[in-house]
Every structure is written in structure tokens, then in C-alpha cells.
């Protein structure tokens, strides 16, 4: 599955870069995040609890940032598995300064297997875009204030 998108921010590109790599901010804004621990090798251990329609559960995985060109570009590698299935993804992130802040363009290739794959690429693509949009909006909010809004009710449950 291939996904892409962009998000605009009122903060400058350096502040955006720092926010995207700040462990405490990430713990607050990653949808369904129950645990995020930075290891010595630069890799994160992560535990997420997410649900799509009737398929929900816990995913345990790893995230690593590579190909860093601060504050312009990085590649995020993520993999995880749990009772609903497994996910492996590579996401390319490009950051740009703009007149009124910054912009992030992203594209992601993801392999999804197990029960969660039975939901279908069309639904999963919509869910992934929704979660990415929520993540980027919450990054903006986290930088503006310490409080993060609770997730809206939808077919997507964050436990």
C-alpha cells in the first residue's frame, strides 16, 4: 500500500524538526501510543493499541530514523506485530520552510498482513490518512500548548 500527504504548520522548520523527534511530544501525539522508548542505538520500542472496525488489538514494534538531512529530510522505518496482524513501513519525510511556517510532505510504502489486511486497502488507506492527519494536527497543538485534545469518536478506536 502506498500513501502520501502533506501537512502545514505555523512553526518554523527547525521547531517542526525538533518536535517530530521529541520523545515526550511523540508519546502524546502518536495515535494509540501506550509506550515509546528511545534505545541507545537510536531505535524506538513502541506499543500501540489501535482498532479499525471490528479488528483491534495491540501492536509491539520498532521505529528507526535513518537518512537524516537535518532539518530537511529523514526516512522512518517502522515494523510491528500483534494479534491483528503485522505492519512494515518505510516513510519518507521532507520538510520545507514557508513564509508562514513550514510544510511536511510524506510518502509511505506499507506492507500489511494478518487479520487487519482483511479490512482492505481502501479502508486501511483512509484510516492511515486519518491517523496521519490527527498526528500532524496534534504535533501543532502540542507545540502551542501542553494539552492534547482527546480523539473524536469514530470507527477508529484508540485504547
PLM segments and residue spans:
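Hydrophobic ligand-binding cavity/cleft-lining segments
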Residues: 1-49, 158-159
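Intrinsic-disorder/low-complexity, polar/charged segments enriched in Ser/Thr/Lys/Arg/Asp/Glu/Gln
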Residues: 2-6, 43-45, 58-60, 73, ...
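Hydrophobic/aromatic beta-strand elements that line small-molecule binding cavities or substrate pockets
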Residues: 7, 34, 61-67, 78, ...
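A generic beta-sheet turn/junction motif
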Residues: 9, 50-54, 69, 82-84, ...
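Mobile acidic interaction elements
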Residues: 29, 35-37, 60, 68-73, ...
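Glycine-rich portal/gate segments that line the openings of hydrophobic small-molecule binding cavities
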Residues: 37-79, 134
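Beta-strand/loop substructures that line and gate deep hydrophobic ligand-binding cavities in soluble
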Residues: 80-127
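A conserved amphipathic terminal alpha-helix motif
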Residues: 113-158
Amino acid at each position: 500500500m502506498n500513501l502520501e500527504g502533506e501537512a502545514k504548520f505555523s512553526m518554523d522548520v527547525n521547531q517542526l524538526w525538533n518536535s517530530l523527534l521529541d520523545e515526550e511530544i511523540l508519546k502524546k501525539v502518536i495515535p494509540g501510543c501506550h509506550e515509546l522508548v528511545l534505545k541507545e542505538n537510536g531505535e524506538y520500542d513502541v506499543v500501540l493499541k489501535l482498532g479499525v472496525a471490528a479488528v483491534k488489538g495491540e501492536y509491539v514494534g520498532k521505529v528507526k530514523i535513518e537518512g537524516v538531512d537535518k532539518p530537511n529530510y529523514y526516512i522512518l522505518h517502522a515494523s510491528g506485530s500483534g494479534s491483528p496482524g503485522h505492519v512494515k513501513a518505510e516513510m519518507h519525510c521532507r520538510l520545507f520552510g514557508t513564509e508562514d511556517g513550514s510544510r511536511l510532505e510524506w510518502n509511505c510504502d506499507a506492507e500489511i498482513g494478518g487479520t487487519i489486511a482483511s479490512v482492505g486497502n481502501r479502508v486501511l488507506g483512509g484510516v492511515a490518512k486519518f491517523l496521519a492527519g490527527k498526528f500532524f494536527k496534534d504535533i501543532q497543538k502540542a507545540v502551542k500548548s501542553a494539552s492534547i485534545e482527546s480523539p473524536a469518536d469514530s470507527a477508529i478506536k484508540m485504547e
